[in-house]
A protein has these predicted regions:
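C-terminal catalytic histidine-bearing segment of alpha/beta-hydrolase fold enzymes
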Residues: 206-208, 212-224, 228-271
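A domain-start/cap signature at the N-terminus of enzymes
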Residues: 7-13, 19-87, 225, 231-234, ...
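Primarily recognizes the serine-hydrolase "nucleophile elbow" in alpha/beta-hydrolase
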Residues: 155-200
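Alpha-helical scaffolding within the catalytic cores
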Residues: 102-113, 136-137, 141, 187-198, ...
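Active-site machinery of serine-nucleophile hydrolases
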Residues: 86-88, 92-138
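Gly/Ser-rich "nucleophile elbow"/oxyanion-hole loop immediately N-terminal to the catalytic nucleophile
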Residues: 75-76, 80-84, 131-163
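Short, proline-enriched alpha-helix->beta-strand connector loops that line the catalytic pocket
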Residues: 118, 199-205
């Protein structure tokens, strides 16, 4: 009897040890590594053309990228204060749609519905041609925008994309998992590999598709469920008849009932 009891204790101990090891592994793979020292690159830092308004700062960089940057008014004259920890949205437009990016997406993320959650900076990044392609270049640009605006929190960057921009936002997250805390994808069609999925487990995704978005849905419909199932606090929002859409502020995910702004509130305020 004592032998049986001893064996039971040993088995229980091994089980608890295994559970503890599994918990430590799970914690490790779901803990996001963030950008360390940022990389200064003069072609991405310096601008050959500038134009500032009360709301937006425009820059044309020597690297060939144009962008608009919004810094909340209360921080605009204190942009070198690193202690402010201002979150940043990086917005990626659809293919050949850079002409409408500022008015459509820039306006959405400077809306009080977003800014009342937390005062956030907004970077509207225009593709060098009609679409985005080079992940290294984009990472360098974002890093150099942060170097110039030290009030931005490099640990709290959220990507937003529509169509090809949504595809690219997920692609960029897979390329450099330390860059984004979360990714918002509307009508994106990136087909994630299992190896990439392991890299982005700590990143939070809101991934939206519509079944009647022919050609897009078929490509992206495997990625969304994988992200929701395995990635931290992630949502797959699948619609029946929404067409080729971008994620909007009042969105609610069918099925789960998750509310976009509530999800975003949690993302932005989480340490």
């Amino acid at each position: 009897m004592n032998g049986i009891k001893k064996n039971v204790i040993i088995v229980a101990g091994i089980f608890l040890l295994a559970m503890g090891i599994c918990a430590l592994i799970a914690k490790a793979i779901y803990t996001r590594k963030t950008l360390g020292e940022l990389t200064f690159e003069p072609d991405y830092y310096w601008a050959e053309e500038k134009a500032d308004t009360d709301k937006w700062d425009f820059r044309k960089t020597y690297a060939g990228y144009d962008y608009f940057l919004y810094i909340p008014p209360e921080y605009k004259n204190d942009r070198h204060n690193e202690s402010l920890k201002v979150p940043l949205f990086v917005l990626f437009h659809g293919s050949e749609n850079k002409g409408i990016s500022l008015g459509r997406y820039g306006r959405m993320f400077t809306d009080k519905k977003i800014q009342s959650i937390r005062s956030c900076a907004v970077l509207v990044l225009l593709a060098r041609c009609g679409y985005y392609s080079d992940c290294h270049d984009t990472s360098m640009l974002i890093q150099n925008v942060i170097i110039q605006n030290e009030c931005i929190d490099k640990k709290n960057i959220v990507a937003f994309g529509h169509s090809q921009g949504a595809y690219y936002a997920v692609k960029l997250a897979c390329y450099e998992p330390r860059l984004f805390k979360a990714v918002i994808s509307g009508s994106g069609y990136y087909q994630i590999t299992h190896r990439e999925l392991l890299k982005v487990l700590p990143i939070q995704f809101w991934f939206g598709l519509s079944k009647n978005d022919k050609g897009i849905y078929e490509q992206g419909c495997t990625t969304g469920p994988l992200l929701e199932k395995f990635c931290k606090n992630s949502v797959y929002a699948e619609y029946e008849n929404r067409g080729h859409f971008w994620v909007e502020l009042d969105d609610v995910a069918p099925g789960s009932g998750r509310v976009f702004l509530e999800w975003l509130d949690k993302v932005l305020k989480e340490a």
